[in-house]
From Swiss-Prot:
PANTHER family: GLUTAMYL-TRNA GLN AMIDOTRANSFERASE SUBUNIT B MITOCHONDRIAL AND PROKARYOTIC PET112-RELATED, GLUTAMYL-TRNA(GLN) AMIDOTRANSFERASE SUBUNIT B, MITOCHONDRIAL. The gene is gatB. Pfam families: GatB_N (PF02934), GatB_Yqey (PF02637). This is Aspartyl/glutamyl-tRNA(Asn/Gln) amidotransferase subunit B. The lineage of its organism: Bacteria, Pseudomonadati, Pseudomonadota, Gammaproteobacteria, Cellvibrionales. Signal peptide: none annotated. It catalyses: L-glutamyl-tRNA(Gln) + L-glutamine + ATP + H2O = L-glutaminyl-tRNA(Gln) + L-glutamate + ADP + phosphate + H(+); L-aspartyl-tRNA(Asn) + L-glutamine + ATP + H2O = L-asparaginyl-tRNA(Asn) + L-glutamate + ADP + phosphate + 2 H(+). It comes from the Bacteria. The keyword Nucleus does not apply.
Length: 481
């Protein structure tokens, strides 16, 4: 039997407003528990919410970025359920008339193909608080600092057919909201959380299978593993004669396993009704036009510009343009060193490797764009080789100064003096007469590989500082005489 996977996503995007969606409380991350929740956030008697205009502006920008219809009239409703970190006993959200209507996002896959993922809608809502379980033996604590933080929840159509497609969409969405500046994208801090709806059906069937929802995934790696495991589990259950239960599941990032939390609720279970404390919000054309005018360059447009202006390949341009901060860093390096391709190679290579190893963002890189451009300039003018450049980069990352300072202090300048190189080549050839004879008698097709021995010996003698191109030219000339 051949199975088909059906995936839809619900993505919670925390908006980067300074205050909450219905109150003036701060949204800053990392404050002491319960120091940023006011009477409005807790729905104390006598309080009334006031909508945050910035949240509406951010949601409008998002809608425009994903080719969606903007709801000029949007209505808030109460979603009623009990949970300890939901102090009101309901969540203020949108259902019937959301601010963002149908739209779409185009994603690129590893094989070079493109796919369109439809967005059903996106709505504004308030976040809940946070339950804390680790610091309280036998009990749980509640931190309400997050309660009332503005979110947009993005709901897709079930258009994705694999973990690869779901992760590609999630990455693209992350790229869009961070480029817009409406979300900081810090997934480890809960700024973006993904709920994954998964079902399977036999290839060719039209009817959707019973779905499960796995909640609050906060990394692309977790999402990929979770989807692959859940698809495998569902297929195994069905092939063994069982039935999939519609349920909500929770993925544990430490054990990399998902477990059942509860049966999956339907909208009716939440008893939605219009919020009596909030009037419908009406957006006029001027508001929408102002939001459009404030939008920065989006990832797709940036990728195309990088291909056309800098001559980057679609792959390189796509990688660099996906993150706004990385794109800015690259452009700063390229402008200072006048070699976009070398700049791209170093940003995607050494810089990216260090950022991943230290789990930091490029805004915290220990080598500035100006310093990296200085290093590339020394490669271009042949002061140092690519191999030596990596040593210099290591020293720069460790705070030992700029490229020129390190090259001078460590004596790393490339040996480009032809007389000095010829002497080193002569010394190596005199010390290895048998290898010289073998080279001269060898089939020409084998000589390039044999040349590597002599290159290695001279590089060893020069402590890696011989100019590779000049060295190759001198060796070939002398060995062929």
């Amino acid at each position: 039997m051949e199975w088909e996977t059906i995936i839809g996503l619900e993505v919670h995007v925390q908006l980067a407003t300074n205050t909450k969606i219905f109150s003036g409380s701060s949204t800053a991350f990392g404050a002491e528990p319960n120091t940023q929740a006011c009477a409005i956030d807790l729905a104390m008697p006598g309080t009334l919410p006031t909508p945050n205009a910035e949240a509406f502006r951010f949601a409008t920008m998002f809608g425009l970025a994903v080719n969606a219809e903007i709801g000029k009239r949007s209505v808030f409703e109460r979603k009623n359920y009990f949970y300890p970190d939901l102090p009101k006993g309901y969540q203020t959200t949108q259902l019937a008339e959301p601010i963002v209507g149908p739209g779409y996002v185009d994603i690129q896959l590893a094989d070079g193909s493109e796919k369109r993922v439809r967005i059903h809608h996106a709505h504004l809502e308030e976040d809940a608080g946070k339950s804390l379980h680790e610091d309280f033996h036998g009990m749980s604590g509640i931190d309400l600092n997050r309660a009332g933080t503005p979110l947009i929840e993005v709901v897709t159509e079930p258009d994705m057919r694999s973990a690869e497609e779901a992760v590609a969409f999630a990455r693209k969405l992350h790229s869009i909201v961070t480029s817009l500046g409406i979300c900081d994208g810090e997934m480890s801090q809960g700024s973006m959380r993904f709920d994954v709806n998964i079902s399977v059906r036999l290839k060719g069937d039209e009817k959707l299978g019973t779905r499960t929802e796995t909640k609050n995934l906060n990394s692309f790696r977790f999402m990929e593993r979770c989807i692959e495991q859940e698809v495998e589990r569902q297929i195994e259950v069905i092939e063994d004669g069982g039935k999939i239960i519609q349920e909500t599941r929770l993925y544990d990032g430490e054990t990399h396993k998902a477990r059942s939390m509860r049966s999956k609720e339907e909208a009716n279970d939440y008893r939605y009704f219009p919020c009596p404390d909030l009037l419908p919000v009406m957006l006029d054309d001027d508001f929408i036009d102002a939001a459009r005018a404030a939008m920065p360059e989006l990832p797709d447009a940036r990728q195309l510009r990088f291909e056309e202006s800098y001559g980057l390949s679609p792959y390189d341009a796509g990688i660099i343009s996906a993150d706004a901060a990385t794109a800015d860093f690259f452009e700063a390096v390229a402008a200072k060193c006048s070699d976009a391709k070398l700049a791209a190679n170093w940003v995607m290579g050494e810089i990216s490797a260090r950022l991943n190893a230290e789990e930091i963002r490029i805004t915290a890189a220990k080598v500035s764009a100006e310093q990296l451009a200085g290093l590339i300039a020394r490669i271009k003018d042949q002061t140092i080789s690519n191999k030596i450049a990596k040593q210099v980069f290591d020293a720069m990352w460790n705070g030992e100064g700029d490229a020129d300072t390190i090259i001078e202090a460590k004596g790393l300048k490339q040996v480009s003096d032809s007389g000095a190189l010829e002497k080193m080549v002569d010394d190596v050839m005199n010390a290895n007469p048998a290898q010289v004879e073998n080279y001269r008698k060898a089939d020409p097709a084998k000589q390039p590989k044999m040349l590597g021995f002599f290159v290695g010996q001279v590089m060893k003698a020069s402590k890696g500082q011989a100019n590779p191109q000049q060295l190759n030219d001198i060796l070939k000339k002398k060995l062929e005489n």
